[in-house]
């Protein structure tokens, strides 16, 4: 049985702790305030803002290899606010469906055996784009047959129905419907690519009264192949994309090459080629600044800020027309499942001095 003296000693110790802990917490708070104040100055070793700003982002709701965040409209609304705060004015649905998973209740695709989605994401994105003064680009359907066969022509048949259907359901209804993303990703002279891009681009423009279209291929650099010796050379890249642009420039308005497959000291060389080719064919030259890190052994964390900065600086030097990213919600958003994404958002704001 506890004696009265032991009980009083315990009570005294508890009282002392009650006094000390708040003081410790208060002092920690002061240290944090001091640290935050110092960090807010963001004394960088490089000139601030000497790069292209990201003004567009893909929306990756039907993903190949990135975890789903399971957001509802409340989370998406908040994310559009975060985008707007750093100057994003364009959102691009990367694909409206992949194999059997789709983003809207498409009568045609449901008839082809696709699964019914629980919500109409296309309608939601268009409403949020209108709310925040953004333009929405619709990404076409990906049946997966191109990835299985490496023949792009398979994608034309399904999208012949999807394009007409989507314009009827949404394009005539929402002012925020601003264009089309032809979602097939290629890197080189892929079989059927020129014909497929031309057919789909032509139909998109005809049905919508000439709204803009774009593609986002990758550069077949050393990070895209298992053996760096097999990476595309600058001359090969220019020759093959000269041929592709020649065949599609009348129905594809812009090309946003993905920037993550080449090394950082190759950016200026390849970017200058891309801009020269785009200018030759009267196309807009965008960059798809990947905000995930291809240099890591896992797929895929948010990118280190300096790597993103180097790529955006190179895009500015090349005179590119627009910078978009793949993709804000996973890799730059303060509410991303990746903790590092919110820190990337903060570093980006510091660099461009965005309040």
Where are these regions (language model features)?
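N-terminal export signals
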Residues: 8-27
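Catalytic domains of carbohydrate-active enzymes, especially glycoside hydrolases
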Residues: 74-99, 248-250, 254
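Aromatic-lined substrate-binding rim segments of carbohydrate-active enzymes
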Residues: 79-80, 92-142, 196-211
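An active-site-proximal structural segment forming one wall of the substrate-binding cleft
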Residues: 118-128, 151-177, 244
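Aromatic-lined carbohydrate-recognition surfaces of secreted/lumenal glycan-active proteins
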Residues: 137-148, 201-236, 257, 284-292
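Active-site groove signature of glycoside hydrolases
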Residues: 141-146, 165-192
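Aromatic- and acid-rich polysaccharide-binding/catalytic face
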Residues: 177-184, 237-266
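Substrate-binding cleft of secreted/luminal carbohydrate-active enzymes
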Residues: 259-263, 284-354
């Amino acid at each position: 049985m506890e004696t009265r003296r032991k009980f009083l000693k315990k009570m005294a110790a508890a009282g002392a702790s009650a006094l000390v802990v708040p003081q410790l917490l208060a002092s920690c708070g002061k240290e944090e305030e001091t640290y935050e104040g110092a960090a807010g100055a963001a004394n960088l070793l490089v000139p601030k803002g000497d790069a292209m700003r990201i003004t567009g982002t893909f929306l990756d709701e039907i993903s190949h290899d990135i975890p789903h965040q399971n957001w509802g409209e409340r989370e998406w609304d908040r994310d559009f606010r975060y985008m707007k705060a750093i100057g994003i004015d364009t959102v691009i649905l990367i694909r409206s469906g992949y194999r059997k998973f789709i983003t809207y209740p498409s009568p045609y695709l449901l008839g082809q055996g696709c699964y019914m989605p629980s919500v109409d994401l296309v309608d939601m994105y268009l409403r949020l784009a209108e709310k925040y003064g953004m333009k929405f680009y619709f990404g076409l359907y990906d049946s997966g047959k191109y990835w299985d066969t490496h023949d792009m022509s398979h994608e034309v048949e399904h999208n012949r129905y999807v394009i007409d259907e989507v314009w009827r359901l949404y394009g005539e209804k929402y002012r925020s419907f601003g264009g089309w993303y032809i979602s097939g990703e290629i890197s080189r002279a892929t079989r059927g690519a020129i014909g497929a891009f031309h057919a789909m681009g032509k139909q998109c423009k005809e049905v919508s009264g000439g709204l803009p279209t774009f593609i986002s291929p990758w550069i077949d650099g050393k990070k895209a192949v298992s053996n760096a010796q097999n990476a595309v050379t600058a001359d090969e890249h220019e020759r093959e994309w000269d041929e592709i642009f020649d065949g599609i420039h009348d129905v594809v308005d812009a090309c946003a090459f993905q920037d993550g497959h080449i090394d950082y000291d190759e950016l200026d060389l390849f970017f200058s080629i891309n801009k020269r080719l785009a200018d030759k064919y009267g196309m807009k030259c965008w960059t798809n600044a990947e905000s995930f890190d291809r240099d890591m052994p896992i797929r895929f964390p948010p990118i280190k800020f300096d790597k993103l900065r180097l790529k955006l600086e190179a895009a500015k030097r090349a005179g590119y027309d627009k910078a978009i990213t793949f993709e804000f919600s996973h890799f730059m958003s303060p509410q991303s499942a990746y903790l590092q994404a919110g820190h990337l958002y903060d570093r980006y704001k510091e660099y461009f001095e965005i309040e």
